[in-house]
């Protein structure tokens, strides 16, 4: 070994030059600056003084102090998130400079310029990628100014995805320019790392210790002892020496075949230059090493390494070779053989070998009485020459049983090669008697023959490992000496230079393996040194004297076909042209060695054609036997309860028929039946008799050999399993057409079978009194029932019910004669409902709130308070959070502003605060009543639902005596908000679609339904959308049906105006000021038993014979769901009616609730707003809409889903309320409860206008005419010119009033409609002089 270099480990202190000292000192300072810069970047706080802001009132939070805060702010502003990489780049540059400080190479300025270009490309593209794909950091752009410029430039041109791809390409080019690395090299490095990781992982999972011999450790110890004195030997030399030693030992193993027998595993136990070794199965057929039929496990394992998958020297055909060695030794007299290589015999021992790990399960096949020839046991000694004794048959043997298919398959072109062999005669010489039995039981793929005495199993045969083995005495036999074959030494084959040569030679030899070469039948001749498998053609099958079973007629054909096929295919297993080796290699282990020919597994059809049965065929045979045993049954299996029920049903029917014959046709088994049922029963009886006749006819005409599953001539094939040659039932059977019953939609088809053939119940259309269900007619009793053979006719009329009723079973309820679906709403349904006993609906109809309430997280609120202070400090606003009020939806933070800070500054920053706090919306409350703080309302992370039941079940609602009490929801503190509609007195509701406006209106209606009786409160509901308020149709509180027509809505409002005038007259007569005082007077008169007569009644006003008396007047609530649609459709007339009601209707007990989703000034005019002070604003789209409703902003910042601002009466500050949620099921439940209490008593004439002319807009001319109308008519008829401007100038009135007068003239027919030029014609004649 050459002398190795030994590194000196001693370190000496050497002085640096002046330039080197200065350079290293400078590098140390730069590294310290990079560390300081990283600390400043990581501890950046927006509230610190920096380049982007100057006002600050807090101590500096940055670890770098004020310079660090300034520098960090500047870097973040320029580079964004890429600023964090700047300290890392600085440290990397210092390391590079320190490593290359001693190199005095020539400076390539072109390379330096390319590196500079690459650095610039990397910086720009990194910032651009961060700006496009990363989130912003603090209040800086994620890519800084550079990334913002690039992203704004690329996005209009390439979009975000295209810009990202373009920047990635430029970044890759910049990396190549800066580093000089090729992307091919980078890809190779990445691939190498991945492969190293996968290799390491796979090596860790594989048992590598099995590949190392025990001798290696000893050899390593020897090497260590030898080289113990070499203390300074390098690690590389030791690894190289170990590798050379392993290679040397591996080569020695290949040279020495007795060491580890590696060639036995790689080349099927043979060398390339050896003669062919012939291995036999237990039946004398040569075993293919790659044959899956004969590649079973060994009975015994050699003393080799059991964990070595490659070098254990055990071929897969060793069990077959051992069996063949013993078999050929005893069958030397059977037939002439050819010389082959001698195989060492297996020594006999007293104790039989253990059972193999894989036990083969024999497949039961058709039994036959023909004896077949079994191979001789292995322990029998060989006989000289060919002196064959007389064959003695003690017991007839059975046909070979095919092993179970899933374990293996035959590995030849012809699937079934199962020849018959002559049985071995009884020998007086005792050998290894147990070997024959063990060979037959253990190696089931080669030979599984048993006598009839042993084969005492039914059709479902037990596995082989469960069968009892015959116990025989085992005579002691001296083991024969093992003869080891001395093979010539040769160089090892496991060298890579011989692979191509071996592969070419092996391809030629393997191609000649499976060439079918017919062998002539040879005469017996003297035995040579080895054995040969006997020819199948030389041993014909012998007829047995035993009785042939009834199944032999069908099996015989398959048996003869199998024997013939085996005779033809016998050369497939012959050993002609088998002089070359048969290598057995493992794929993926070692080099690419010659591979054997792929084996084609026979198909199911090929196996079945030669009589080889599969597990599915055995199951089919089993089913066929069961079908033959149960050929007179219905073919379907039922449980005991179903069979008992059907038997009881049939007995009941027979009993009813007997009683009818005895007592007449009127007897119905103690159950009265109407005439229609009697006719249906008669038709059913005729259908049953007809079915029974057809069944007898088909069962009598069944031919003798029509049974397709008879086992007499059974020959199974995969195609026959799908066919059925037996008679089938007809597809269309004539059925007696029943009488159509008008009240029953469809009755199930009743099929009457014989008593011994019960039918299953059908779950689809089963009736309670009829447990049986349709069954295919004309069922063949001897034919097995299959699901595809049961045909039903959905297009034919259905048979009626049975002719009798069973008393113990309830009768099916008849459906109601209606065409309405049960899921459709029945408005005005007359079905009787159960009347509740309580005066008002129960709260159980509403959804209860959850019992567990999520606690308030005070720690999270404290964190949010600190964050609010920090965000306000970012906008140069000094404020402290002094308190917070958590609610179900939002949390209000009370801010104590610094002196001199205006609340308007925070209000203008509401959207910026929402963005910086990452919330949906922020509402600023400039004035909190009773507190000197400013409120900041933020939404909660987990929003809670406000249930209507928990608001109604409150003392504020229960203790309020007003029948017009309504609940709105909860405020921000979680307290319920209850209002009185009588004090409002009118309500205006506005909100966009989906804001919860309709849900809020439903909550108000339900709260009044839970508070008032129909005699206290009545409703007039106007629903132009025909969706929201139509669900209340039919409740007793309605004065009229829900109004959906716009003209009817105008008439309803006019009726309200007339009712208001009538009530004012009555109140003035009684001397009261409001409806409550009027009702008190009426109640007092009732207590005095002196009712008050109507003072304004005249005898011609009504048909009453007596003078009517005054009664209690209820409150009237007019609800308009979509006020804007009503205004746009009918026009300004509705505005006048609403304005009159809003002005005067409060004292008369008439209240308006107007809801709209378009809060514009042309819908909510100043006249309406002036008379409706109470308003509720849900989420609106803009501040303008918020000011239209509330006269102030704030509604645009609501969260939606019931979040509202409630401006109560006599108050200018709105209260934020979270509306109660009402489900549709709750609304329907309350409505149904009130419908069950009584019907509504509608008032006639509310939606009709009998005094107006058609199409006149529904105006009452006597009451709605202008005071100047008569004078204007006289003026127009005299001048014969109708114009708005003329009337305006003549009477000196406004334009709107003049236009109204002209429209009234048009309505009265005085003037015509406006023409295309704007002129009108005067239709009335001129006045008389």
UniProtKB/Swiss-Prot annotation:
CDD domains for this protein: TrwB_TraG_TraD_VirD4
Pfam families for this protein: FtsK_4TM (PF13491), FtsK_alpha (PF17854), FtsK_gamma (PF09397), FtsK_SpoIIIE (PF01580)
Stretches for region Gamma: 1259-1329
SMART domains, per the entry: Ftsk_gamma
Region (Linker): 184-817
Swiss-Prot/TrEMBL induction comment: Induced by DNA-damaging agents.
Protein name: DNA translocase FtsK
Organism the protein comes from: Escherichia coli (strain K12)
Lineage of the organism: Bacteria, Pseudomonadati, Pseudomonadota, Gammaproteobacteria, Enterobacterales
């Amino acid at each position: 070994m050459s002398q190795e270099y030994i590194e000196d480990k001693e370190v000496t202190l050497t002085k640096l030059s002046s330039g080197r000292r200065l350079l290293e000192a400078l590098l140390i300072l730069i590294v310290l600056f990079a560390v300081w810069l990283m600390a400043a970047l990581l501890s950046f706080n927006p509230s610190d003084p920096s380049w982007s802001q100057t006002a600050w009132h807090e101590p500096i939070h940055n670890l770098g102090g004020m310079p660090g805060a300034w520098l960090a702010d500047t870097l973040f502003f320029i580079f964004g998130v890429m600023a964090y990489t700047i300290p890392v780049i600085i440290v990397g540059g210092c390391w590079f400079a320190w490593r290359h400080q001693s190199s005095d190479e020539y400076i390539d300025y072109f390379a330096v310029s390319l590196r500079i270009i690459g650095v610039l490309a990397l910086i720009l593209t990194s910032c651009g990628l961060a700006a496009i794909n990363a989130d912003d950091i603090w209040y800086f752009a994620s890519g800084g100014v550079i990334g913002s410029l690039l992203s704004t430039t690329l996005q209009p041109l390439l979009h975000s995805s295209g810009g990202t791809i373009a920047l990635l390409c430029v970044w890759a080019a910049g990396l190549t320019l800066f580093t000089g690395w090729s992307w091919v090299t980078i890809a190779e490095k990445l691939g190498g790392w991945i492969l190293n990781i996968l290799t390491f992982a796979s090596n860790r999972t594989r048992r590598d210790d099995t590949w190392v011999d025990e001798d290696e450790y000893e050899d390593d110890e020897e090497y260590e002892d030898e080289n113990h004195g070499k203390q300074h030997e390098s690690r590389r030399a030791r690894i190289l020496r170990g590798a050379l030693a392993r290679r040397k030992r591996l080569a020695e193993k290949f040279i020495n075949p007795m060491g580890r027998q590696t060639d036995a595993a790689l080349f099927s136990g043979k060398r390339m230059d050896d003669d062919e070794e012939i291995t036999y199965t237990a039946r004398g057929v040569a075993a293919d090493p790659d044959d899956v039929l004969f590649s079973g496990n060994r009975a015994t394992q050699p003393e080799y390494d059991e964990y070595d998958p490659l070098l254990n020297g055990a071929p897969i055909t060793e069990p077959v070779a051992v069996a063949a060695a013993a078999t050929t030794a005893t069958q030397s007299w059977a037939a002439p053989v050819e010389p082959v290589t001698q195989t060492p015999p297996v020594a006999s021992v007293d104790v039989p070998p253990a059972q193999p790990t894989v036990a083969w399960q024999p497949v039961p096949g058709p039994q036959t009485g023909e004896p077949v020839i079994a191979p001789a046991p292995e322990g029998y000694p060989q006989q000289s020459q060919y002196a064959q004794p007389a064959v003695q048959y003690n017991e007839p043997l059975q046909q070979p049983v095919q092993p179970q298919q899933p374990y293996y398959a035959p590995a030849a072109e012809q699937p079934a090669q199962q020849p018959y062999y002559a049985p071995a005669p009884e020998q007086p010489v005792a050998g290894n008697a147990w070997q024959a039995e063990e060979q037959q039981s253990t190696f089931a793929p080669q030979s599984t023959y048993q006598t009839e005495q042993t084969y005492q199993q039914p059709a479902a045969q037990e596995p082989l490992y469960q069968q009892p083995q015959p116990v025989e005495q085992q005579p002691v036999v001296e083991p024969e000496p093992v003869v080891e074959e001395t093979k010539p030494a040769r160089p090892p084959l496991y060298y890579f230079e011989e692979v191509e040569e071996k592969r070419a030679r092996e391809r030629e030899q393997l191609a000649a393996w499976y060439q079918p070469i017919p062998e002539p039948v040879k005469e017996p001749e003297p035995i040579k040194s080895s054995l040969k498998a006997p020819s199948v053609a030389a041993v014909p099958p012998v007829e047995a004297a035993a009785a042939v079973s009834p199944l032999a007629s069908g099996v015989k054909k398959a048996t003869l076909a199998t024997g013939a096929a085996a005779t033809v295919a016998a050369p497939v297993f012959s050993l002609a042209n088998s002089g070359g080796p048969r290598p057995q290699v493992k794929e993926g282990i070692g080099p690419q060695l010659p591979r054997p020919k792929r084996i084609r597994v026979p198909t199911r059809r090929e196996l079945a054609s030669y009589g080889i049965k599969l597990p599915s065929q055995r199951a089919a045979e089993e089913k066929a036997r069961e079908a033959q045993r149960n050929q007179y049954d219905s073919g379907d299996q039922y449980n005991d309860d179903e069979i008992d029920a059907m038997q009881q049903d049939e007995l009941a029917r027979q009993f009813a028929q007997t009683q009818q014959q005895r007592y007449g046709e009127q007897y119905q088994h103690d159950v009265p039946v109407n005439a229609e049922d009697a006719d249906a029963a008669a038709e059913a009886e005729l259908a049953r008799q007809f079915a029974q006749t057809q069944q007898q006819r088909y069962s009598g005409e069944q031919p003798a050999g029509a049974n397709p599953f008879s086992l007499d001539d059974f020959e199974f094939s995969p195609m026959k399993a799908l066919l059925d040659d037996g008679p089938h039932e007809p597809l269309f059977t004539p059925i007696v057409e029943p009488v159509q019953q008008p009240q029953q939609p469809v009755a199930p088809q009743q099929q009457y079978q014989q008593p011994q053939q019960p039918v299953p119940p059908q779950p689809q259309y089963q009736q309670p009194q009829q447990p049986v269900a349709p069954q295919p007619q004309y069922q063949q009793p001897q034919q097995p029932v299959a699901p595809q053979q049961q045909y039903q006719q959905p297009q034919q009329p259905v048979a009626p019910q049975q002719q009798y009723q069973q008393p113990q079973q309830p009768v099916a309820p008849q459906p109601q004669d209606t065409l309405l679906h049960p899921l459709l709403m029945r408005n005005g349904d007359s079905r009787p409902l159960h009347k509740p006993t309580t005066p008002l609906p129960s709260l159980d109809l509403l959804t209860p709130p959850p019992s567990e309430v999520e606690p308030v997280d005070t720690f999270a609120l404290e964190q949010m308070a600190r964050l609010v202070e920090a965000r306000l400090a970012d906008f140069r606003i000094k404020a402290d959070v002094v308190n917070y009020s958590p609610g179900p939806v939002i949390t209000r933070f009370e801010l104590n502003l610094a002196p001199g800070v205006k609340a308007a500054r925070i209000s203008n920053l509401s959207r910026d605060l929402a963005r910086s706090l990452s919330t949906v919306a922020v509402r600023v409350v400039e004035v909190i009543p009773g507190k000197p703080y400013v409120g900041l309302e933020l939404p909660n992370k987990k929003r809670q639902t406000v249930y209507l039941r928990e608001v109604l079940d409150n003392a504020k609602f229960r203790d309020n005596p007003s029948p017009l009490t309504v609940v709105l929801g909860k405020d921000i503190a979680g307290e319920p908000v209850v209002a009185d509609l009588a004090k409002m007195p009118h309500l205006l509701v506005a909100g966009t679609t989906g804001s919860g406006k309709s849900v809020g209106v439903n909550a108000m209606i339900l709260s009044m339904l839970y508070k008032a009786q129909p005699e206290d409160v009545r409703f007039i509901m106007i629903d132009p959308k025909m969706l929201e308020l139509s669900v209340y149709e039919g409740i007793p509180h309605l004065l009229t049906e829900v109004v959906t027509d716009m003209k009817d809505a105008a008439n309803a409002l006019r009726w309200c105006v007339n009712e208001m005038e009538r009530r004012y007259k009555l109140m003035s007569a009684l001397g009261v000021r409001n409806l409550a005082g009027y009702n008190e007077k009426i109640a007092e008169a009732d207590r005095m038993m002196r009712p008050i007569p109507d003072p304004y009644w005249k005898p011609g006003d009504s048909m009453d014979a007596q003078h009517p008396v005054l009664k209690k007047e209820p409150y009237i609530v007019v609800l308009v769901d979509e006020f804007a649609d009503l205004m746009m459709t009918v026009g300004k007339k509705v505005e006048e009616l609403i304005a009159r009601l809003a002005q005067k209707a409060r004292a008369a007990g008439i209240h308006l609730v107007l809801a709209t989703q378009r809060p514009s000034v042309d819908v909510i005019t100043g006249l309406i707003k002036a008379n409706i002070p109470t308003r509720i604003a849900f989420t609106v789209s803009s501040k303008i809409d918020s000011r239209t409703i509330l006269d102030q902003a704030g509604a645009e910042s609501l969260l939606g889903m019931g979040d509202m601002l409630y401006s109560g009466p006599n108050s200018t500050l709105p209260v934020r309320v979270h509306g109660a949620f009402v489900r549709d099921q709750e609304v329907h439940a309350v409505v149904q409860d009130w419908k069950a209490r009584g019907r509504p008593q509608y008032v006639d004439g509310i939606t009709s206008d009998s005094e107006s002319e058609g199409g006149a807009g529904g105006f009452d001319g006597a009451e709605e005419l202008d005071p100047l109308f008569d004078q204007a008519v006289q003026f127009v008829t005299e001048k014969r010119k109708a114009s708005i401007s003329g009337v305006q100038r003549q009477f000196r009135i406004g334009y709107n009033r003049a236009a109204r007068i002209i429209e009234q003239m048009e309505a009265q027919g005085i003037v015509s409609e406006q023409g295309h030029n704007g002129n009108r014609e005067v239709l009335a004649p001129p006045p008389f002089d």
